[in-house]
Amino acid sequence: MINLHQPILGTEELDAIAEVFASNWIGLGPRTRTFEAEFAHHLGVDPEQVVFLNSGTAALFLTVQVLDLGPGDDVVLPSISFVAAANAIASSGARPVFCDVDPRTLNPTLDDVARAITPATKAVLLLHYGGSPGEVTAIADFCREKGLMLIEDSACAVASSVHGTACGTFGDLATWSFDAMKILVTGDGGMFYAADPELAHRARRLAYHGLEQMSGFDSAKSSNRWWDIRVEDIGQRLIGNDMTAALGSVQLRKLPEFINRRREIATQYDRLLSDVPGVLLPPTLPDGHVSSHYFYWVQLAPEIRDQVAQQMLERGIYTSYRYPPLHKVPIYRADCKLPSAEDACRRTLLLPLHPSLDDAEVRTVADEFQKAVEHHISQRSPLRK
C-alpha cells in the first residue's frame, strides 16, 4: 500500500531514545527543555515563549484556557478545520462560529473571516491548510485592528512562512502537532506558543496541574519545605516528556531534508498531472509564501471523486479528504451556508505525500490517478453506449 502519510524514523531516533533510557529519566526533564529551545530557534522566538506538550490537541485546548474563553464568547474558525479546534472552543462553553474558505486554497480569506465576526467574537482560530500560509498577514492585521486574539493552528505548517516570518508567530497564540502522521513526528506531541511571555508562563503552569513549580528539585532551590505545593490555576497534566522530546530534536534536525523532498514530490505531481482532464492542481503560492507541503490536493468533478478514490484504493494507493466541513458535522450543525467549503468537500482529494515516496511511486500514483479519472469520465460520457 502506498500510504497517504508516513513518518521517516531511523537509527538517529533509536540512538536518541537509547540515551534517554541510559539517563534513567524518561519524564519531563532536560531534553524537553532542549527541544523547546531548538524549536523556538526554528521559529525565531524566545524559548520562554514555547511549551512542549503531549499532543497538538492539548495545545489547542490550552489556548482556550489561557485566554479564559467561556460562555458568551464567540470564536471564528474556518469550517474546513480539524475537529479538535472546534472541540477545544466548545469545551470551554464558548461558541465556534464557522466561516467559509477560498474554494481552491481551502484557507479562509480576510473577507470570509470578517463576514463571520459577531459582537461576541473574542478570537479567531486560523488553520494553514495543507501547509499553505493563506492570508495570515492580512488576517493578523485585521485581528489587531479589531482587538481580537488570533490563534494559529499550525499543525500543517511546521516549516511554512511568509517573507521569512514563521507561520504560528503572526498571531497571539499558536499550536503545532507532532503526531505519527505529521511532518515532524514524536509519536504523540505538540507545541504551544504565546507572543506574550506571561501567557506562555501561565500555559506552562496550566499544563502541569496549575502548579507554579514543576518538581521538588525546583522547589528546593527556593524553599526548605520543597514538598509543599503552590497551586495558581486549575490545570491538567498536558506536559511532554524526554522520550518524545528526544525524538523531536532529531526530527527537527532532519526537517529541511523532509521539506525539500516534499517540495520535490509536489513539483513532480504538478508536472505529471498537468494534462489530466478536468482536474485542478493546488494553486500557485504567492511570492514570499513558503509551504510545508503537508497535503497535495487535487480537485475534480464531485460525480467521480469518490469512485476515483475507490479505484486507487483497489490499486493499492490510499487517498483521502481533509477536512469535512465542521458546520455539517451533527454535533456542530450550524444554521449557515458556506458554499465554498461545501463545494471543496465534494471535489477535493489528497494524494500520497511523504518523504518515503520514491520517484517510481510518485509516477505510479500519478499514472493510476490519471487512469482512474479518465475511466470514470468516459463512464459518464453521454456518448457511452
Swiss-Prot record:
Protein keywords: Aminotransferase, Pyridoxal phosphate, Transferase
Which EC number(s) are documented for this chain? 2.6.1.110
Cofactor(s) the protein needs:
pyridoxal 5'-phosphate
Top-level taxon of origin: Bacteria
Gene Ontology BP annotations: polysaccharide biosynthetic process
List every position bearing N6-(pyridoxal phosphate)lysine.
K182
Q: Which reaction does it catalyse?
A: dTDP-4-amino-2,3,4,6-tetradeoxy-alpha-D-erythro-hexopyranose + 2-oxoglutarate = dTDP-4-dehydro-2,3,6-trideoxy-alpha-D-hexopyranose + L-glutamate
What InterPro entries does the annotation carry? DegT/StrS_aminotransferase, PyrdxlP-dep_Trfase, PyrdxlP-dep_Trfase_major, PyrdxlP-dep_Trfase_small
**GO MF:** pyridoxal phosphate binding; transaminase activity
Signal peptide location in the record?
Answer: none
Function noted in UniProt: Involved in the biosynthesis of forosamine ((4-dimethylamino)-2,3,4,6-tetradeoxy-alpha-D-threo-hexopyranose), a highly deoxygenated sugar component of several bioactive natural products such as the insecticidal spinosyns A and D. It can also use pyruvate, but less efficiently than alpha-ketoglutarate.
Q: State the similarity comment.
A: Belongs to the DegT/DnrJ/EryC1 family.
Assembly and interaction partners? Homodimer.
Q: What is this protein called?
A: dTDP-4-dehydro-2,3,6-trideoxy-D-glucose 4-aminotransferase
Natural source organism: Saccharopolyspora spinosa
